[in-house]
Amino acid sequence: MKGGMAGLMKQAQQMQEKMAKMQEELANAEVTGKAGGDMVTVVMTGRHDIKRVSIDPSLLEGVSEDDREVLEDLFAAAVNDAVRKIESNSQEKMSGMTAGMQLPPGMKLPF
């Protein structure tokens, strides 16, 4: 019985390590979303960070290249700000439910 418990603990530890590695891989993955026939493109990480926004110049006729780039950066910053606020709100609301639970570092609820 003692050996079985040790084996079970070892399996649990290995599973936790694999989960942490998978969470890191998912967090670092990048996906691209497109709209309007590829006229607007957004690149986002698994951490929900907007890395890049591209707006086709034809959508912003009369706007300089520099102003278009500023608009793209501001859009990315605004979305990132909204995502952080949602995450903070979710974490705050869930903290009451998870009080006393021992979750691995970095693990967020809901899963």
UniProtKB/Swiss-Prot annotation:
The lineage of its organism: Bacteria, Pseudomonadati, Pseudomonadota, Gammaproteobacteria, Pseudomonadales. This is Nucleoid-associated protein PFL_1905. Binds to DNA and alters its conformation. May be involved in regulation of gene expression, nucleoid organization and DNA protection. The keyword Oxidoreductase does not apply. Residues 1-20, 88-111 are annotated as: Disordered. It is found in: Cytoplasm, Nucleoid. Coiled coil: none annotated. The keyword DNA-binding applies. Belongs to the YbaB/EbfC family. One of its GO terms (cellular component) is cytosol. Its main location: cytoplasm. Transmembrane segments: none annotated.
